[in-house]
Swiss-Prot record:
GO terms for molecular function: arginine deiminase activity. It comes from Streptococcus pneumoniae serotype 4 (strain ATCC BAA-334 / TIGR4). The keyword Cytoplasm applies. PANTHER family: ARGININE DEIMINASE (PTHR47271:SF2). The active site is at C399. The lineage of its organism: Bacteria, Bacillati, Bacillota, Bacilli, Lactobacillales. HAMAP family: Arg_deiminase. GO terms for biological process: arginine catabolic process to ornithine; arginine deiminase pathway. This is Arginine deiminase.
Amino acid sequence: MSSHPIQVFSEIGKLKKVMLHRPGKELENLLPDYLERLLFDDIPFLEDAQKEHDAFAQALRDEGIEVLYLEQLAAESLTSPEIRDQFIEEYLDEANIRDRQTKVAIRELLHGIKDNQELVEKTMAGIQKVELPEIPDEAKDLTDLVESEYPFAIDPMPNLYFTRDPFATIGNAVSLNHMFADTRNRETLYGKYIFKYHPIYGGKVDLVYNREEDTRIEGGDELVLSKDVLAVGISQRTDAASIEKLLVNIFKKNVGFKKVLAFEFANNRKFMHLDTVFTMVDYDKFTIHPEIEGDLHVYSVTYENEKLKIVEEKGDLAELLAQNLGVEKVHLIRCGGGNIVAAAREQWNDGSNTLTIAPGVVVVYDRNTVTNKILEEYGLRLIKIRGSELVRGRGGPRCMSMPFEREEV
């Protein structure tokens, strides 16, 4: 194994190191009237969500996996007063603060927080207007008057516990993503600082995509099938143009991959990412949501003579995967056993969104009983976690984790 700080050349190699984010006060800033704006369907109960997340982290540690936390890595990246000040200014610039007085007050509030991790967690939680000095009526501008009912000076980032999406580890490199919605795109700022300034990761990891790009891509659509083959999803959250940029960079930087399988499927919230409908759980086994199979289009992409070569694959998906992975046969394990009711219910509760921590060893939500039973019948060992509150954000174990190091397979 190389000493490189990022080592992810598969979806199934034994997981050695992973990054999570423990849900924080950002969840307590979710309001019913603004759920759609913040990409949520419901409001998790923070205390129970934290208990569930702590149990998830402990289950990983029990398997010998080192657990890192986004909030700690980001705090450790603020290695000088100058970098700390720069972080605050970038955070303010990206927060869409419309009037100067509010921005000045927030800057003062943030500079008053001396502990780096407390500062990072405050930027994640968002800032309510009531935390700031009252602006006198005669000093209010039109924006203040028009938006007087909106409670936040800066929106919270409640999706942060889905660490899979703001950036993706690919081989020894990282795709620092430009995300689908403004409310999530601000999350990528933490990855920028980690991979630029962190004592271990800063300046040591190639970027194969950058958050300054103007087209969208998210980590839930980026899967590392093997040291030679990637899978990417063309989805609600990821543009085909972004995939082309990513692939050109991967091939030009010689990250090590020879081919990409691009999956085009239904563009809607319930199938927001490829990993909500398709994950790899063993050398020759994948979970899949049966509802995507009819409309699925797969394209093979290679890089020849300084340009991308794209071929639409017309054959059977299992045969295509077997051919590209060098195995005799691939088993597609259908969420809900293919039963239309069970499949729809369990896919909504992330029955297809599994985290493989070693070949045939998979972390799942315990609530998806039909799918879990079928996975066990295929010989997989399941590590079942509770997710009654975590699942309200529409993400499962893979969504909640970003591998930093896996053993080679």
